[in-house]
């Protein structure tokens, strides 16, 4: 993940709005990202039409992802490689077990 140094401008956000509000902003942006991803999934499946082309939702998803990362920067959150690898291995094992059935 390549996060530009310019995005560190968000580091002062909690001091400006308070930590509770910064966490609320993260929660809201996560929900908006999830909503955009669900719209894309519906477009890809072709069921339950969403009314707009997939590219508009892809643009929205990129915007919301940037908002989530901005809030994470504000709260000093960073990805944890150990957790990520552990979760990938667990997920991969489940998929392999499903294929074997």
Task: Locate each region found by the language model.
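Flexible "arm" and connector segments at domain edges
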Residues: 1-101
């Amino acid at each position: 993940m390549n996060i530009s140094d310019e995005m560190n401008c968000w580091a002062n956000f909690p001091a400006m709005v308070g930590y509770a509000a910064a966490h609320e902003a993260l929660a809201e942006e996560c929900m908006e990202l999830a909503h955009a991803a669900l719209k894309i999934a519906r477009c890809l499946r072709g069921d339950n039409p969403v009314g707009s082309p997939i590219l508009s939702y892809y643009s929205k998803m990129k915007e919301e992802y940037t908002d989530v990362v901005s809030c994470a920067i504000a709260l000093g959150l960073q990805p944890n490689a150990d957790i990520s690898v552990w979760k990938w291995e667990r997920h991969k094992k489940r998929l392999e077990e499903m294929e074997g059935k």
